[in-house]
């Protein structure tokens, strides 16, 4: 969970001809499947694309991420660039210690990832719906781990087996100081 503080501000209200002062507001945010689904249902387009979001779309995603109750809508008008950058850094965090080491890089799927597709993966992999509130990158890692662990073991070619055995034998020879 991310906590950001929108600082207090002072500005001139042209309509009322007076200075207006706003109090600082602390928001609790979570980048989750729930917030992704809310945003996609409002904008009717996928959030997880390489396309830049407009300021309006970004601010609306912050609204969708908000866990704090009873936040006045005008509070979001006072988000600073620093607040937006902090949210973007949080969205990019892996939120897990799991790392994947792939033997061969295959070209990525061209399938567009939407909230419904992620829910489908959760159902297929028997991931409980409580996980929809996790940080999205942590959920993606769990989905990937479940997918990898549910696959049948990979069959190795004869060449790969011989190469692995040769490496193991060389390591044992070195460890035990023998010639074979």
Task: Name each model-derived stretch.
Residues 1-41, 52, 67-155:
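An amphipathic, hydrophobic-aromatic interaction surface with interspersed Lys/Arg
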Residues 55-69:
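Short, hydrophobic/proline-enriched secondary-structure or compact coil segments at domain edges
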Residues 142-180:
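Alpha-helical oligomerization segments
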């Amino acid at each position: 969970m991310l906590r950001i503080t929108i600082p207090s501000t002072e500005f001139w209200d042209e309509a009322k001809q007076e200075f207006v002062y706003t109090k600082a507001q602390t928001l609790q945010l979570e980048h989750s499947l729930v917030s992704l689904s809310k945003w996609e249902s409002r904008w009717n387009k996928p959030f997880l694309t390489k396309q830049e979001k407009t300021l309006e779309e970004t601010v609306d995603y912050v609204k969708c991420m908000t866990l704090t109750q009873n936040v006045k809508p005008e509070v979001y008008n006072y988000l600073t660039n620093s607040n937006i950058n902090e949210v973007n850094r949080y969205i990019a965090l892996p939120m897990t210690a799991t790392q994947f080491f792939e033997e061969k890089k295959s070209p990525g799927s061209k399938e567009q990832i939407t909230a419904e597709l992620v829910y489908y993966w959760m159902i297929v992999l028997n991931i409980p719906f409580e996980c929809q509130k996790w940080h999205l990158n942590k959920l993606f890692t769990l989905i990937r781990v479940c997918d990898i662990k549910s696959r049948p073991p990979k069959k190795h070619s004869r060449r790969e087996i011989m190469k692995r055995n040769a490496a193991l034998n060389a390591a044992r020879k070195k460890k035990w100081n023998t010639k074979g």
